[in-house]
Amino acid sequence: MHGPKPTVQEIVLELCPYNEIQPVDLVCHEQLGDSDDEIDEPDHAVNHHQHLLLARRDEQQRHRIQCLCCKCNKALQLVVEASRDNLRTLQQLFMDSLNFVCPWCATETQ
């Protein structure tokens, strides 16, 4: 380009006829590395691992719960042993309607 503005004479186009279909190489030329460092687990090992996870889910575990007395708002701590599913049920009860009363408020109301 000569000058501040391009002109049509300065633009050079080379057109080639493209009427024929040209073949495209679709073969992947990648090579896989050694599979020695990969560990292939048999299906029974995977199933055993899933079984262990399910067994652990059903296993009783201790959980510390901190909450407030519904009467005097004192902090309460209690420990429960429950499976994960049962703990989830207890959590739903806390969210819905379950309230705890401390020992002092429990004796005063009787």
From Swiss-Prot:
Record-annotated membrane-spanning stretches: none
UniProt motif LXCXE motif: location: 26-30
InterPro entries: Papilloma_E7 (IPR000148)
Any one GO BP annotation for this protein: symbiont-mediated suppression of host type I interferon-mediated signaling pathway
Isomerase is among the record's keywords: no
Any Pfam family: E7
Zn finger residue spans: unnamed: 69-105
Subcellular localization(s) per the UniProt record: Host cytoplasm; Host nucleus
Motif (Nuclear export signal): 87-95
Keyword annotations from UniProtKB, A to Z: Activator, DNA-binding, Early protein, G1/S host cell cycle checkpoint dysregulation by virus, Host cytoplasm, Host nucleus, Host-virus interaction, Inhibition of host innate immune response by virus, Inhibition of host interferon signaling pathway by virus, Interferon antiviral system evasion, Metal-binding, Modulation of host cell cycle by virus, Oncogene, Transcription, Transcription regulation, Viral immunoevasion, Zinc, Zinc-finger
GO cellular component terms, semicolon-separated: host cell cytoplasm; host cell nucleus
Region (E7 terminal domain): 1-47
This protein's record includes keyword Transcription: yes
Main localization, broad class: host cell
Entry comment on modification after translation: Highly phosphorylated.
Assembly with partners or alone: Homodimer. Homooligomer. Interacts with host RB1; this interaction induces dissociation of RB1-E2F1 complex thereby disrupting RB1 activity. Interacts with host EP300; this interaction represses EP300 transcriptional activity. Interacts with protein E2; this interaction inhibits E7 oncogenic activity. Interacts with host TMEM173/STING; this interaction impairs the ability of TMEM173/STING to sense cytosolic DNA and promote the production of type I interferon (IFN-alpha and IFN-beta).
Free-text comment on this protein's domains from its UniProt entry: The E7 terminal domain is an intrinsically disordered domain, whose flexibility and conformational transitions confer target adaptability to the oncoprotein. It allows adaptation to a variety of protein targets and exposes the PEST degradation sequence that regulates its turnover in the cell.
Biological role stated in the UniProt entry: Plays a role in viral genome replication by driving entry of quiescent cells into the cell cycle. Stimulation of progression from G1 to S phase allows the virus to efficiently use the cellular DNA replicating machinery to achieve viral genome replication. E7 protein has both transforming and trans-activating activities. Induces the disassembly of the E2F1 transcription factor from RB1, with subsequent transcriptional activation of E2F1-regulated S-phase genes. Interferes with host histone deacetylation mediated by HDAC1 and HDAC2, leading to transcription activation.
Name this protein carries in UniProt: Protein E7
Source organism per UniProt: Human papillomavirus 68
Gene label: E7
